[in-house]
Amino acid sequence: MKNLFYSMVLALCWQSNLSAQETFYVSSSGSDDNPGTKEQPWYSLNADNWTDGCTIIVLDEIYLDPVIDVSKEATIKEVTIKGGSPEAAIMGVNDDEFNDGEMNVSSFFDLKRVKLNLEDITLKNLHRDGGTGSGGMIYVDPYSELNLNNVVVRNGVVTTGVNCRGGAICSEGKLVVKNTIFEGCKAYQGGAVCLRESENPIYARFEDCIFRNNETGDGVAEDGSGAAGGALYIEGMEMDIAFDKCYFDSNVATNTARNATGGGIRLFLNEECNANVTFMNCTVANNKSVGASGFMHWARCEQGNVNLKFVNNVFYKNRTEGPQANLITSQKSAPTVGMSGSFVFVNNTSMMNNTGVDGLVQTDQNAINFSDFGGDFDLVFVNNIMLDCMIEPIDKGDGTMVDQLGWGWSIREKDARSKGEYIIKNNLIDGVGGAYDATWGAGFLYHFNNEDIATANNNKSVRGKSTDQKLKQVGINRKLTEPTEGIPYIEINDPEGYAIDNGVSSLIYKGEELIPQTDIRGVAKTGNSRDLGAFEYNGVVSSVNEFKVDSQVHVYLNHLTGILYFSEEVASVQMYTSFGMPCIPSAVNVTSVNIQNLEKGIYIVRIVDKNGKVYSEKILK
């Protein structure tokens, strides 16, 4: 059992600062009677003794139960909690207790009008027992801000009580997350994270994050759309949300009623919305729903402005057991004539996103499925590879052979079509489908079904070919490549394949260049044109793959000072993130460089010695 249960009430509000910033230490071997120094640490987080702007350093695993209540009446406006060792963790119960089903009284943190920073630490093993509030581990009110950097969030569960939203986090305020893993979390709405608008617009940023094995479950919520969003549930009118270099892996929307939607994300847009949601350089793989939409279920608003953007992403083997699309679904019973905005889909690679994989056979499934738009809504579809009907001929059971299952993209243009701009060019796809009424004019389907228009815009179909024929013609791998660092991707493997240099090199849309100049790994564009999809073949990569590794110069990092030392003077040194992006200015003729301001993570040091030899070292900061 837990060896500590304590009650802490922390009142935080926007009042004057009463004390200078301090640093306090916490250890399971300490005592709350101690002054909280490194030599004499506290035993608990000891919130009654915090000061505004203080930093709490957790040295090992500590328990937290019940919640640190952030009420409106206190003097503290900002607190930072960070790990001081690799073992540092805040937990509700230990691993054995969690696996045995032991539950907790409440959440970890309840933020009201405060800024909380969590760094270099693990939050784990909280199964909330009842309660009326949202957020399994953390609730963020509309006037608060939560920042996570290099955090592991594991086993946050909320499936009992009222408002079972966000197994890890429910945010109604500002949320900024970097280098963070959400794993094994579960809730009725938003297995890992719930983003809701109440009094202020939603603002959220996710960079270098992993959402893995999160799921929906049974439960209740006072309002909303039911069980949805294996990784995230998003609901509101106004929102600004962006995902960059994130990996959505094996998240599931499931519940007893089997109507859960959005294996990865449920995007619920309320009326008169103003929404901007962006995905760049992300990989979405093996997500599943039992209701509808393997990755994203998008509930459109009938009035408002919506801009969804997908650039440089990989979508692989996402699927649903329900009646709608395996990747993205947006269905309405009537055309959304009052909704304006855009759906931008550029340089993405989409493969095997249908139920005709892994032993599941259906003949009417699609990767993307949209119903009638009707309003001033733009559809931008450029430089994509969509090979989602990747099934050899099979017998349906009645002797009928089916050689293609579903479509890559299906859109209904029967009752109306979008009156916005269509930019549809340089795509390779194994089929588009849907309902089309020619009296509405040249819509999305017209750009593919009219042979002259398709040829003029370089939109090529490979429907009717076998799987091996498609892969060979495109010159692309069948499976994900999993690098040592960074997110998985699908690799172009043939310099003579159709994908090479067949993309648009530049596209200015509403004053913005849409064509990415680097691929999903950070590899720069080679030649005058981007390759199709999210991968650039044979590009110049600023990563360990470019470098020789027989190092004669030794590298030493002083973790206290943030100074990187070399055993001898080097001609030049450059540093890159694990995604191949430069992170400090190049230094010449040096014996050390200062990397104190770099965030914690894995970096590649590229060194040129005095003899001109080039090699690399990996370091962990």
Residue ranges and their predicted role:
Residues 53, 66-72, 76, 103, ...:
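Predominantly extracellular beta-rich ligand-binding scaffolds that present long acidic/polar faces
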Residues 497-543:
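Surface beta-loop-beta hairpin patches that serve as ligand-binding interfaces in beta-rich domains
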Residues 50-53, 64-82, 90-145, 159-173, ...:
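Extracellular beta-strand-rich solenoid/capping regions of secreted or surface-exposed proteins
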Residues 26, 58, 69-70, 83, ...:
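Extracellular beta-strand solenoids
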